[in-house]
Amino acid sequence: ARRAALGERLRTVIGHVRHEIGHFLFSRLVPTEGFAPGFRALFGDERADYADALARHYRSGPPPGWEAAHVTGYASAHPHEDWAESAAHLLHLVDIADSAAAAGLGIEGLARGEDAYAEADAARLLDVAARLGLALNHVTRAMGLEDPYPFVLAPPVREKLAFAHGWLRAGPPGAEAGPGR
């Protein structure tokens, strides 16, 4: 009911947690040299009035055609939300690819046991994960269920996801190197 009331096609606890992690990661990355100019070129100026933007979004909804540049309608509300939604969807997609590889599910471009978190090529990762998402949608439709990943990754969305991928792999200065870095 809440999902429908908010016009959200996917509303899960893990999605919410990943979205909030996106906000946290932004706060860690924004002071990093080079992050803000690239961010603003893709997402817009995060210094725009946040309260006004959210009030407008909840009053009027997303603008017509939001799908051409945003992963969700909510992402169109403000650059902060665009980043948080993009980061959350990147985490969804990496986990889809990683889970499929761990389960031995075959799809061209993804080897059994491959570590999707270590993938340095954002375009390759997004291609594989988007195809897996589509495959999952087909499988669940065969069972009469809703799509688990009902999103279209338009080229500007893929560009934002790739930007997030690059910065999340690099991390802020002083971040400890983890797998794939």
Language model features by range: what are they?
Residues 1-5, 64-71, 116-117:
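Short glycine/proline-rich turn/loop motifs
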Residues 1-17:
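Short pre-active-site segment immediately N-terminal to the catalytic Zn-binding motif
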Residues 7-11, 70-73, 77, 122:
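Residues at structural and domain junctions
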Residues 12-14, 32, 72, 140:
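Residue-identity detector for threonine
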Residues 14, 18, 77-80:
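Hydrophobic alpha-helical segments and helix-packing faces
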Residues 16-29:
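Catalytic glutamate of the conserved HExxH
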Residues 26-83, 87-97:
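Post-HExxH zinc-binding segment in Zn-dependent metallohydrolases
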Residues 75-181:
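Pan-zinc metallopeptidase signature
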